[in-house]
Amino acid sequence: MSSISLKENGGEVSVKKDYSNGGGVRDLYGEDSATEDHLITPWTFSVASGCSLLRDPRYNKGLAFTEGERDAHYLRGLLPPSVFNQELQEKRLMHNLRQYEVPLHRYMALMDLQERNERLFYKLLIDNVAELLPVVYTPTVGEACQKYGSIFRRPQGLYISLKEKGKILEVLKNWPEKSIQVIVVTDGERILGLGDLGCQGMGIPVGKLSLYTALGGVRPSSCLPVTIDVGTNNEKLLNDEFYIGLRQRRATGQEYATFLDEFMRAVKQNYGEKVLVQFEDFANHNAFDLLEKYSSSHLVFNDDIQGTASVVLAGLLASLKLVGGTLADHTFLFLGAGEAGTGIAELIAVEVSKQTKAPVEETRKKIWLVDSKGLIVSSRLESLQQFKKPWAHEHEPVKGLLEAVKAIKPTVLIGSSGAGKTFTKEVVETMASLNEKPLILALSNPTSQSECTAEEAYTWSKGRAIFASGSPFDPVEYEGKLFVPGQANNAYIFPGFGLGLIMSGAIRVRDEMLLAASEALAAQVSEENYDKGLIYPPFTNIRKISANIAAKVAAKAYDLGLASHLKRPKDLVKYAESCMYSPGYRSYR
């Protein structure tokens, strides 16, 4: 005999085994004998026990299953006999991670962990945030996106391509989780400072949402990473046999706008008015248009424009204790007039307007921007993109950054250009000659694209610069003094900002909320931090920081009448802390 027969006997199924076919068993469902042309049914069973429990990252605890749980859930023999607690598992994993010398290998190991044991992944990230943040996000995530086609294992988010035009609502319904509160979406056109990575930009939404959970306490099941694939103009990817996206040039114009509009309408229809949609790494020309178009009808947030602006403003507010004066006393010069540069500039102008009661049009006049063609001045007005026009001030044309520094005499120099090594020795020395304590922010990511390094800023300014960067740099010793460079990382703001919107049930984002987040972050900088030259608090207290930011954002939502969760909690900080996801293991019956 060479088959298994199933017979019903009094309502029960009995199995007659047949091992005559080489010790094997009969292919009951036809999978083994099926050809590609032969359709089969993909049977699945959803009983959370045995192997299925071990393979479900939401419930798997690995060696932390207790003796009782192993008996109750048919795990005997499927695990080694030792029982570890979560702390020992964490210790073992951190030991293993530290053996990897290549950051990308650490990234891949962490993504593997996330796919097999969700709670242990977040426990690891929360407890070791300063060490692991550069791995799960900038700068390592940039390299991961560049090589995403080669290291791709399994989908971690939702891919919506032009193939799904007219069916986006159906695609959203394919996602297994239904109570979505935060969506991070990219079209992959401007990934960090790396350019068009197309569909491989998925690493950015995945990384951002892991930080929403680890740093802001938003439940993983409430987060949805989305990549909108409208093609890519990256010839290298189009010719790469391992590229995982559409092999066509990018859709533009009306086709692009219609597709994005279908996505936004489907999101609102499927998840409701209060789902937060965070636009991530869109090209400048689309980022501003999308934010302007949907800010009045959806709960939308652009981290590159608004998140960066909020975290930089927080650093500027904190730095006043070191450099003196008020924000209105300073003159700002930006290298880079894209999403980040203009977004930061506008929020600074709004904050100065709030402090001085002067019109925003007036407060913009002490903020100057340099783009690829030089200083943005009124004589260039006709040729400027719309979002640059508010920054075209009266001044003779100036071509280079060094010439602009000499002409404008800024007290604050901010780089958001995505062009590395542009804060040259001459530029930094000129800033130091103009100011006792020049404030220099080199914000571009990843590290290779930073306008200057921390060591260069401190050395060229003879230890007088107040420095912060977008990517992490090691502490620098200069003439016997240790300088700890701050990182103007958006991760300070967006997790707490998102939590504040969620816990208040906010239906729209307003500038007042961004200002509240900046002020809350600046207030967390301690005297000890200032003594080290820091203008940002350490990441070790990030959940406390996020709770305070969330409370201020929620309070502003209630004040503006934009909160839908009534009634208002008395202690918003405690309420924020109570809303946060905890990654500790749960006990199973």
From Swiss-Prot:
It catalyses: (S)-malate + NADP(+) = pyruvate + CO2 + NADPH; oxaloacetate + H(+) = pyruvate + CO2. Belongs to the malic enzymes family. Its EC number is 1.1.1.40. It comes from Phaseolus vulgaris. Signal peptide: none annotated. One of its GO terms (molecular function) is oxaloacetate decarboxylase activity. This is NADP-dependent malic enzyme. NAD(+) binds at residues 190, 304, 445. Induction: By fungal elicitor. Divalent metal cations. Prefers magnesium or manganese. A divalent metal cation binds at residues 280-281, 304. The record marks 304 as: Important for activity. Keywords: Cytoplasm, Metal-binding, NADP, Oxidoreductase. NADP(+) binds at residues 333-349. InterPro entries: Aminoacid_DH-like_N_sf, Malic_enzyme_CS, Malic_N_dom, Malic_N_dom_sf, Malic_NAD-bd, Malic_OxRdtase, NAD(P)-bd_dom_sf. One of its GO terms (biological process) is malate metabolic process.
